[in-house]
């Protein structure tokens, strides 16, 4: 047996798409064997419904009569029959003779067909003139490249002759003695066995569950082609009805019809009395224009059946069962047009909101710095509180979260606050106004789609601190004067505390950032988003700056987008990273001094200034790749001694591990160190007393490797140049960078035994609170220790 024959004998036809599949591509867990492609397309939860629909439709339309080749390999003792080339030629000659007779009969039926199709008379006439010789309205000569089972006139006529001659069941193999030239042999050319898919032979009245097709034998290629194109499946079991009245009684299996026919109303001449149904296990191709083979114009139908409903039926799931097509092309089983329109509008609205968010994040660095001080300060303060939860005033179960702010203005108009809200929480649906999300919440609550709400700020409440139950009106936090930047944000007692729900940490900013930030190698530096760089992988990312900024710099807020996009990556991977760190035998940097984990990093000046804006794709093609990189780096670059003795205030413990030995890993390791600490800031906010621990986490993220620096680092006090990996960084103000001598003097001046605040002399507050940050005792000891041995990456 040749390799081709072995291969064909192993193939099984899918019940829905009728394509020959290898056993590994078939799934047997349902009532009929189906291929993985159909299951994936329809969905495992709906596939049984689709199978039952297909079964009913095939039975209703007489698909299980003679002439269709069966499916799986034959059982033991049953031999398949293959025709030689000579026999195939004789069969083809007989088919041609039958075609001539069938053509004459079909031409008579064309007139009756046209009278029945009042709504489609003109299109029907054009189509009938194009049918290839046979002029049968349903058995079309479709282009072989477009339709899977286009039927030629000769093949269709041969099928008719075969069906008329053969009256016995197609499952009785081997066939009875029939002359080699008879077309009945042609109707069962492909090899197969007596039962479809191994099922027992069904009774004539119920018909087989499906007709599985084998690949044709290599020794009968010509005849098998004729069989597949013309007689595969009991195509025409009845010739024109001599009694007149109806159209010709032709039974054509749906799986042999073009998909444009399957998804549209079937012809009254093609299908028996049962009403037409929409089948189609796949979305159909675009219907051919009227007059072209396979186009809607070829659809014969009873009065009131519209051919245009083909596109309507194809627009919804093809698994809808027993859907009658009405005169207007409406399908009762489909989703109503108003629901479809509403869904379409919602998708468009969400796309527009995401576009606004993307634009806001992309231009934030340039725009926020140029905005008036009141606008900039308000945005910084509000951004430092995100994300936080909001709910609908009338239904507390409807929850969303505010995750970003921006200021917009039209020419000649004042600035107005814009806030971005995700609703429902974790859904990724973004609203760019409070009124928009309040309207949607109202519709979800009251099921009233007509009413709009005047002001969303009156209907939304925010929780000041997660879990406290202290819900306040959003309009009190953001009154009109604040929204138009006439006044500053109310006092700190009104500001919500950031909270990132661990169950749905993915913020919509990630979707926006990832979509516009292609992946880059781990060692690639981040570049500005709008920079027309030739390095496509990093062109959309922001370049990290290590040189000091002006004291009133909005650098932190300018990096909101990147911080947010990193934030939900960290939250997604937080638990895995914690396990990795604990397995590595050292504490997270944020825990190095034994303090509790700090709260989630607010997306404002604090975390943004202190954490370089880097996106997850830079660590690799996926977050998991980045996580693996984290684990590898943590396992080799740190030791328990490092983690406890040198904190990130000095930026040396982790920075030194990324020095000369492996330059390519510098950005990656700095990222890892920041993510280590930051992910501890993600899940639940403890009291502000834990915030001083933040200065362990962030400062090392500000100074960069010389590879990525755009300028020298200088001490804020003495203006001497700083070491790239060894200095003190204020976690609240990015421009506060200090050398060790100045930091040492400041600590001594403040008194090392009490609270020691920023060496600048200011009590720089933590974002979202009035509590100033202070050095931890371990950090003070490190700074006062004088010369610190900077360990190299490969040191024992």
Curated annotation (Swiss-Prot):
One of its GO terms (biological process) is protein ubiquitination. It is found in: Nucleus. Pathway: Protein modification; protein ubiquitination. Highly expressed in the heart, moderately in skeletal muscle and pancreas, and weakly in brain, kidney, liver, testis, thyroid gland and lymphocytes. Residues 218-227, 304-324, 522-540, 648-667 have a biased composition (Low complexity). One of its GO terms (cellular component) is extracellular space. Probable E3 ubiquitin protein ligase involved in the proteasome-mediated ubiquitin-dependent degradation of target proteins. Through the degradation of CTNNB1, functions downstream of FOXF2 to negatively regulate the Wnt signaling pathway. Probably plays a role in the development of the central nervous system and in neuronal maintenance. Also acts as a transcriptional regulator of genes controlling female reproductive function. May play a role in gene transcription by transactivating GNRH1 promoter and repressing PENK promoter. This is Probable E3 ubiquitin-protein ligase IRF2BPL.
């Amino acid at each position: 047996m040749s390799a081709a024959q072995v291969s064909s004998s192993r193939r099984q036809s899918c019940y829905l798409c009728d394509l020959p599949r290898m056993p590994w591509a078939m799934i047997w867990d349902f009532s009929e064997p189906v291929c993985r492609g159909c299951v994936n397309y329809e969905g495992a939860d709906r596939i049984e419904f689709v199978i039952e629909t297909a079964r009913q439709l095939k039975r209703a339309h007489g698909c299980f009569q003679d002439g269709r080749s069966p499916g799986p390999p034959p059982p033991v003792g049953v031999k398949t029959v293959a025709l030689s080339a000579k026999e195939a030629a004789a069969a083809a000659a007989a088919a041609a003779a039958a075609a001539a007779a069938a053509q004459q009969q079909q031409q008579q039926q064309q007139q009756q067909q046209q009278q029945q199709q009042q709504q489609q008379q003109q299109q029907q006439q054009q189509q009938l003139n194009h049918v290839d010789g046979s002029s049968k309205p349903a058995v079309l000569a479709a282009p072989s490249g477009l339709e899977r089972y286009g039927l030629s006139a000769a093949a269709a006529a041969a099928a008719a002759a075969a069906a008329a001659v053969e009256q016995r069941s197609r499952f009785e193999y081997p066939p009875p003695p029939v002359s080699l030239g008879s077309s009945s042999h042609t109707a069962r050319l492909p090899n197969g066995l007596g039962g479809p898919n191994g099922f027992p032979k069904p009774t004539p009245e119920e018909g087989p569950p499906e007709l599985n097709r084998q690949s044709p034998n290599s020794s009968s290629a010509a005849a098998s082609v004729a069989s597949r194109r013309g007689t595969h499946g009991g195509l025409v079991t009845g010739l024109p009805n001599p009694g007149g009245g109806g159209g010709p009684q032709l039974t054509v299996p749906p799986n042999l019809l073009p998909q444009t026919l399957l998804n549209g109303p079937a012809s009254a001449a093609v299908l028996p009395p049962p009403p037409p149904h929409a089948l189609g296990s796949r979305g159909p191709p675009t219907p051919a224009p009227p007059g072209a083979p396979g186009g809607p114009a070829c659809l014969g139908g009873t009065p009131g059946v519209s051919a245009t409903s083909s596109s309507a039926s194809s627009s919804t799931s093809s698994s809808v069962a027993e859907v009658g097509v009405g005169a207007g092309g409406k399908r009762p089983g489909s989703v109503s047009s108003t629901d479809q329109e509403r869904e379409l509008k919602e998708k468009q609205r969400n796309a527009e909101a995401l576009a606004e968010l993307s634009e806001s994040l992309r231009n934030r660095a340039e725009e926020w710095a140029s905005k008036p001080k009141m606008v900039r300060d308000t945005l910084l303060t509000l951004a430092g509180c995100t994300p936080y939860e909001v709910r609908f005033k009338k239904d507390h179960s409807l929850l969303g979260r505010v995750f970003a702010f921006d200021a917009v203005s039209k020419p000649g108009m004042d600035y107005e606050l814009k806030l971005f809200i995700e609703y429902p929480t974790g859904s990724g649906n973004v609203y760019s106004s409070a009124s928009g999300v309040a309207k949607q919440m109202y519709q979800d609550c009251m099921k009233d789609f007509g009413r709009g709400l005047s002001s969303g700020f009156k209907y939304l409440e925010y929780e000041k601190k997660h879990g406290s139950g202290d819900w306040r009106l959003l309009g009190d936090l953001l009154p009109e004067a604040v929204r138009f930047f006439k006044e500053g944000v109310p006092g700190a007692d009104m500001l919500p505390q950031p909270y990132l729900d661990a169950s749905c940490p993915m913020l919509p900013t990630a979707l926006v950032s990832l979509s516009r930030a292609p992946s880059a190698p781990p060692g690639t530096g981040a570049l500005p988003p709008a920079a027309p760089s030739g390095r496509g992988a990093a062109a959309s990312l922001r370049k990290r700056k290590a040189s000091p900024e002006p004291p009133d710099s909005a650098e932190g807020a300018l990096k909101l987008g990147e911080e947010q996009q990193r934030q939900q990556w960290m939250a997604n991977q937080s638990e895995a990273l914690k396990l990795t760190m604990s397995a590595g035998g050292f504490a997270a940097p944020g825990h190095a001094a034994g303090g509790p984990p700090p709260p989630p990093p607010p997306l404002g000046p604090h975390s943004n200034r202190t954490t370089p804006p880097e996106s997850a794709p830079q660590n690799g093609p996926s977050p998991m790749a980045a996580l693996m990189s984290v684990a590898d780096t943590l396992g080799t670059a740190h030791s328990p001694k490092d983690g406890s003795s040198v904190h990130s205030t000095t930026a040396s413990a982790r920075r030194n591990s990324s020095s000369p030995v492996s330059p390519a890993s510098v950005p990656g390791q700095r990222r890892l160190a920041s993510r280590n600490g930051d992910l501890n800031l993600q899940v639940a906010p403890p009291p502000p007393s834990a915030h001083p621990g933040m200065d362990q986490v962030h400062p090392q993220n500000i100074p960069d490797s010389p590879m990525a620096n755009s300028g020298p680092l200088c001490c804020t006090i003495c203006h001497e140049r700083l070491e790239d990996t060894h200095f003190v960084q204020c976690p609240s103000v990015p421009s506060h960078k200090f050398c060790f001598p100045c930091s040492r003097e400041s600590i001594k001046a403040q008194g090392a035994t009490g609270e020691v605040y920023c060496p600048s002399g200011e009590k720089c507050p933590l974002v979202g609170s009035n509590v100033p940050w202070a050095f931890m005792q371990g950090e003070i000891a490190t700074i006062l220790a004088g010369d610190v041995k900077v360990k190299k990456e490969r040191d024992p």
